[in-house]
Amino acid sequence: MKTEKKPMPVVGRTDDLRISAVRALIAPQLLLEELPVDSAALATVTHARQAVHRILHGADDRLMAVVGPCSIHDSGAALEYAARLRGAAARHAGDLFVVMRVYFEKPRTTVGWKGFINDPHLDGSFAINEGLKLARKLLLDINRMGLPCGTEFLDLLSPQYISDLIAWGAIGARTTESQTHRQLASGLSCPVGFKNGTDGSIRVAVDALRAAAAPHAFMGMTKTGQAAIFETIGNEDCHVILRGGKTPNYDAAGVEAAAKELGAAGLAPHLMIDFSHANASKQYQKQIEVGADVARQIGAGDERIVGVMVESHLNPGRQDLVPGQPLAHGVSITDPCLGWDDTATLLETLANGVRQRRLAANE
């Protein structure tokens, strides 16, 4: 006669088995009280969101240009860059609406430095509370200069700490298909661009636009740090960002294909073109070539191109982050960027394209 095996007794615990440490995270409200938005920053953000809304809906024929470093790792260099970009933005204000790219979070294919919020000291100390404070202070300083800021929303909690200072947001190629990021975009107070998939697929971005325009209910954290259920009304100010895939998609054929896919889904064909990433075949200097092609399309009268994105820093190229070695000033530590001189020339090229588009429209 067989004896029935008794179940093994439960020993120990079943949760947090791979968590090595838990540290307190500052509540968003405490940081917002320590670094409150002032009237100057508020005016910059409000005006910029309204301007982007008008551009996306055809009421403003300027070209939105999101320009700046691949990622922020040095507040001082970022402010120096912002001062230069503010001057260029003022010079081209009639043709371009310039937003500074201020990216604090970096999606990684495997592992690596995850950005200024996650590791502000660049040493693996993960001083996230300090990173949040430094990020918010930098955004305040740039907005006070009258220059609006754009960022990528990657972590689902970080918007509670900085989103009131963001004029335009992006959802990256790796997260465009993520349901949680689509839900987040549906509740953000700023316009949002969704990149096409890493393989070049436009469909995932089109689906993201439709999802983000709809109401959602999801779990999140309030400004006071409490778990809560958020209900959104949907975001009408979302658009596609063409960043290339297996092949570039910045050219006229790529724009046409994306516009057709948007039209087939009943969506307006409003497109931003990322000059970097797969559109530049990961060669940062090709952004100049890509920009020239896009400027020609704009100059020929294409009104579907409403924005561009440029990875640019004080100095060109990139550098490795090596422990114990000083970093060169104003050089990216993530993707390589154009230097300032090439950036200034590229902005002039784009502004000229917008002026030509106006002439074409009046003929």
Task: Kindly label every feature range from the protein language model.
Residues K2, P9-D15, A82, D95-Y250, ...:
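Active-site-facing alpha/beta catalytic cores
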Residues D15-A59:
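N- or domain-start disorder-to-order transition segments that initiate the globular core
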Residues A27-P36, T232-G244, L327:
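Gly-rich Lys/Arg/Thr-decorated short loops/hinges at beta-loop-alpha junctions or inter-strand turns
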Residues L56-A59, R86-A93, K137-G146, E231-T232, ...:
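Acidic (Asp/Glu)-rich catalytic clusters
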Residues M64-A77, D335:
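Conserved phosphate/anionic-ligand binding catalytic regions in large, soluble enzymes, centered on
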Residues G68, I273, G339:
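Conserved, mostly hydrophobic/aromatic
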Residues H239-G245, N249, A257-M272:
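A contiguous, surface-oriented mixed alpha/beta subdomain in the mid-to-C-terminal portion of proteins
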Residues H313-L359:
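Internal helix-turn-beta structural module
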